[in-house]
Amino acid sequence: MFHVLTLTYLCPLDVVXQTRPAHV
């Protein structure tokens, strides 16, 4: 379940991605 930890760590970035255009 290491992937879950990654998603949790990137959670804030995901929220920003939803409020802002793709910053990738």
Curated annotation (Swiss-Prot):
> What domain of life?
Bacteria
- Protein's recorded name: 12 kDa protein
Question: Upper lineage ranks?
Answer: Bacteria, Bacillati, Actinomycetota, Actinomycetes, Mycobacteriales
